Amino acid sequence: MDRETVDGEITSGASGAFARCGVVLAVPALLLVGSCAASAQGPKLLLPMATLQTAAAFDAARAAFEHCRKAGYTVTVAVVDRGGHALAVLRDPLAGPHTVNTAIGKASTAASFRMDTGDLARETQSGRPQSGIRDVPGVVAVGGGLPVQAKGSLVGGIGVSGAPSGDADTICAKAGIAAVSDNLELE
């Protein structure tokens, strides 16, 4: 067996290498244990948040879609999560091709700014202090998008595109939220 000297002691080759590594590994292990204990006492790293489920998104989209259809409008309805990612999109076969991206954009904008996109349109008109918001990529400052909230927390947005006006789109979006609002508050 090979013999080495570690800290003045004679050891065999294998255990000598282990002895050196053991000391080197022990220090990071103690630091890791210490950091775990510190994080247990420190601030939380994850935030609990309400999340809109796909079934609720679909129910809201369907209710908005049917409300518009009964009014004689051919529209697209989109529901997004709080990050603006599409959860449900319903498009009438006769709705214009632009309505899909516009509905998603309205829903995402409503969620991002936490406000009715019709109000955002008024607040960002030319000459207003916030008019530059209209130039932000992905922002759709046209009526028809509403934030979706549950127990006071933002969980997503709904957007409707294709009705004769932004106000008509908004009425349909409100019908979609109303269809699921009781269930959102219970969960």
Give the label of every model feature segment:
Residues 1-19:
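N-terminal secretory signal peptides that target proteins for export/translocation
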Residues 5-8, 34, 167:
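Intrinsically disordered, low-complexity peptide-like regions
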Residues 13-16, 21-34:
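Bacterial N-terminal signal peptides
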Residues 39-187:
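Flexible, solvent-exposed loop/hinge segments and secondary-structure transition points
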